């Protein structure tokens, strides 16, 4: 599968004197991006194999190279002339004192360094902080629907059914039955993600943690916080899990790129509201596997997929809140997504269907209360031709939104 969006980011950042840090959930294709796609690009542009130093640190055979002094000596021994060397380190967080190693590599005048990592606690936070102005992060998401469709083709609605059930981890494409796909996703939780989180955080109660993950999977698109989740455990699960532990567990999930938090934003007051947030899964197949594929609700999943699509396009995405006042009451209306990038902003509603005027009014109510000039978009599941409604809002179909990345600019 071509991953041109990310490959172009790597190509444009060549020789920029920064460490290129490719982050993303385990099994999302980081190694393939660097060791295959980027490697092939280097060869095609005339770089010789002996000037590409590649080390997969999660390979047992390279266990000795997780020692900082050993790996630095290994790299220095392979640099034998003044030509430029491309150094590619996969799962760099497995090196002891890896920030010191990266600092040392920055001092090699004829080296261009690329690393991958699958834990943001060690990477996005530590590395980007440690290498202020010297680190260039590229976040790799699982396959988008467009990447999948452009590679596989076929009936887009049949592919959509598969996508909203099994998600976009590249390993899914190698499996030829629904049973195998479901088993693969379930096993990833046990053998990869949970194992990583237990090891990195010295987690004692893995079942308690998995139970919280299942709760998060069942409430995508719902506003929550540790206090609300604590009450859920008491009332629904008849279990005690205090908010401090819940907050810690949520940070573990975010650090492993399993989930992302979208904060609530007061549109008119132009400030964040710190009480409740929404959480979305970076891969919808992993979310469904947590629930044994029992709650595959297309409307909620569609909202999650739209969130992921906006994020991979580079937007910061918040949940918008706007106040509606009448003579009798004041109530908060929600805008599903406030998507920001530089001076661009879009207000977006995910509307699975608008079968009647009441539903249409419900979806439009919050957008009507926003009095600025940024574009307001309602995305429907139906395959419709994009149009403006009487309010000046843009109504687009889900397929157009997912398959035409320039559509929002063109509306």
Located regions from the model:
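Short regulatory helix/loop adjacent to the ATP-binding pocket of P-loop NTPases
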Residues: 121-137, 151-153
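Pre-Walker A adenine-sensing motif
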Residues: 1-15
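Short glycine-rich substrate-engagement loop in P-loop NTPases that contacts/grips substrate
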Residues: 53-82
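P-loop (Walker A) phosphate-binding loop of NTP-binding proteins
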Residues: 25
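A cross-kingdom feature that marks ATP-driven nucleic-acid transaction machinery
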Residues: 1, 32, 39, 43, ...
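Hydrophobic anchor at the beta1->P-loop junction of P-loop NTPases
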Residues: 22
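Structural recognition of the conserved hydrophobic beta-strand(s) that form the central parallel beta-sheet
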Residues: 112-118, 139
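Interdomain hinge/linker elements that couple catalytic modules in large macromolecular machines
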Residues: 145-323
